[in-house]
Amino acid sequence: MTKYKLEYIWLDATRPYQTLRGKTQIKEFDAFPTLEQLPLWGFDGSSTLQAEGRTSDCVLKPVTVYPDPVRTNGALVMCEVMMPDAETPHASNTRATVLDDEGAWFGFEQEYFFYKNGRPLGFPEQGYPAPQGPYYTGVGYKNVGDVARQIVEEHLDICLAAGINHEGINAEVAKGQWEFQIFGKGSKKAADEVCVARYLLVRLTEKYGIDVEFHCKPLGDTDWNGSGMHANFSTAYLREVGGQDYFEALMAAFEKNLHDHINVYGPDNHLRLTGKHETAPWDKFSYGVADRGASIRVPHSFVNNAYPGYLEDRRANSQGDPYQMLLSS
């Protein structure tokens, strides 16, 4: 029997943005544990805004497990939060509301800033660095510094070793801003892996004395890009059949549900979706071929192939709850 370090990970009830929590327990197994072998576990919900002190117990229900490459005999256990009966989903548990669909494919582009001492990494103590332009996909110390690339490369390796379907990294438009991409076949798979990848990034930066800032517009009303979580999506029908009529009907449905979508695409999105910095205004729906200033970007390949394929919803922001985004798509 081997002692395994099980890191149980969940989303708390902090508002307006649910943050990730984690705690470790040790259990013995003959081999790396399967999901079915992982026990339920309790936690103090009064300290995560998920319960009151007089009835503080909440339950963690494992829903997926990955190897933890950072720890010897470690496991990363993504969990849903349940009520004390272990059967009723907690009100903050948005994952439980998602019907899994193996034909639904999602690719999330998670943007974020590195912060140190309250400012984006690479910014001077006062004022701003040179304007945007050289930083996107940039190389060289003056564009990306030294420690940022070290972190994103290490995060990439950790995710791949954990079995997360991490598809790539790049420096983003603003200095100190980066992106990673996660793809999943199946609604819940993609969202689970985004959450675990976020957790791994935040945990990794601890040893560098650096924070990860997921707010969508941390630099406010300035000439610096905000952070999104663009969602590339398709269904089996959209990939295999599609067609212009179906596409136009789909866009009409998206326009009709504009405000419902914006409500779950992350807090403070009005600060980011201004019509500037590669965004569409938050209160207007639009789509266009290769248009990064539209709500929905339509790839050239989609039109050239007679309208089967995938689409990109550019409105979701970097603090978006991926489970709620699945419900809106």
UniProtKB/Swiss-Prot annotation:
Broad EC category:
ligase
The cellular component terms of Gene Ontology attached to this UniProt record, alphabetical and capped at eight, are: cytoplasm
Location of this chain's protein in the cell: Cytoplasm
- Domain GS catalytic, by residue range, is 89-329
Q: Which domain of life is it from?
A: Bacteria
Q: Binding positions for ATP?
A: E167
Q: Could you say which residues bind Mg(2+) here?
A: E109, E111, E172, E179
Q: Where is the GS beta-grasp domain?
A: 4-86
- Cofactor(s) of this protein: Mg(2+)
Q: Which GO terms describe its biological process?
A: glutamine biosynthetic process; nitrogen fixation
- Keywords annotated in UniProt: ATP-binding, Cytoplasm, Ligase, Magnesium, Metal-binding, Nitrogen fixation, Nucleotide-binding, Plasmid
- The entry marks the following residues as binding L-glutamate, namely E278
SUPFAM superfamilies recorded: Glutamine synthetase, N-terminal domain, Glutamine synthetase/guanido kinase
Signal peptide range in chain numbering: none
User: Per the record's keyword annotation, is Amino-acid biosynthesis included, yes or no?
Assistant: no
In short, the EC number is: 6.3.1.2
Q: Which reaction does it catalyse?
A: L-glutamate + NH4(+) + ATP = L-glutamine + ADP + phosphate + H(+)
Q: Give an example GO molecular function.
A: glutamine synthetase activity
Describe its assembly: Homooctamer and homotetramer.
- Family membership, please give it: Belongs to the glutamine synthetase family.
Family matches, as PANTHER family: GLUTAMINE SYNTHETASE, GLUTAMINE SYNTHETASE 2 CYTOPLASMIC
Protein role: Catalyzes the ATP-dependent biosynthesis of glutamine from glutamate and ammonia.
Q: Report the protein name in the record.
A: Glutamine synthetase
Q: Which organism is it from?
A: Rhizobium meliloti (Ensifer meliloti)
- Phylogenetic placement of the source organism: Bacteria, Pseudomonadati, Pseudomonadota, Alphaproteobacteria, Hyphomicrobiales
